[in-house]
Amino acid sequence: MAIGIVGRKRGMTRVFTEEGGSIPVTVVEADPNRVTQVKTEESDGYRAVQVTAGRRKPQRVRKPEAGHFARAGVEAGRGVWEFRLDKGQRASDEEMPETGGSIDVGGFEAGQKVDVTGTTKGRGFAGTVRRHNFRAQRNTHGNSKSHRVPGSIGQCQSPGRVFKGKKMAGQMGNRRATIQNLEVVRVDSERNLLLIRGAVPGAVGSDLIVRPASKA
């Protein structure tokens, strides 16, 4: 049973089918994740599996983290991630990994639907036309210096403020995003690779979280 796995984006390529079709895929390299903690309803109030991935220099590990990794008997990784088991995702005790064990790509299979979470590429400060797909105003016919301005951002005295969440200019990208219901095209257990149909958030080399689809 696939609970989830943390990997890194290695780029995009294509896979050809026997019929000659071309499928664009993202290559995710997911080395075996080391289990640092298994949470249960009795001790933590919910069921989850906490993992780490990658390597980190010992001098870069803080003492609380070093103690946590040492108790689990695993090497310190570049981060800690948690895969929570919801009520609809019931796993028996035999299927749950043990602390100090590992999770690899073998839990996934071709054709399976997954959700991929990553950090989008940062685009810097952007206006509303680029950031929110606002329509630009006229170039002529009385429009002076207001071609790409957003227009009105609210009312007058009532309510006398700008509502929270108003779409305005600001930082674009560099935020957490999830693409749902992507198909696993191929699983390469020997090279720890997942080939996922389509594009996923993030730059090459960034961390990705791959989970079984929640809405499949």
From Swiss-Prot:
InterPro entries documented for this protein: Ribosomal_uL3, Ribosomal_uL3_bac/org-type, Ribosomal_uL3_CS, Transl_B-barrel_sf
GO molecular function: rRNA binding; structural constituent of ribosome
Keywords: Methylation, Ribonucleoprotein, Ribosomal protein, RNA-binding, rRNA-binding
GO cellular component labels: cytosolic large ribosomal subunit
Gene Ontology biological-process entries: translation
UniProt-annotated stretches for the region Disordered: 89-108, 139-158
Keyword Nucleus: no
Processing after translation: Methylated by PrmB.
Modified-residue entries (N5-methylglutamine), positions: 157
Pfam family, one: Ribosomal_L3
Cited function: One of the primary rRNA binding proteins, it binds directly near the 3'-end of the 23S rRNA, where it nucleates assembly of the 50S subunit.
Similarity section: Belongs to the universal ribosomal protein uL3 family.
Subunit relationships: Part of the 50S ribosomal subunit. Forms a cluster with proteins L14 and L19.
Protein name: Large ribosomal subunit protein uL3
Source organism phylogeny: Bacteria, Pseudomonadati, Pseudomonadota, Gammaproteobacteria, Chromatiales
Encoding gene (name): rplC
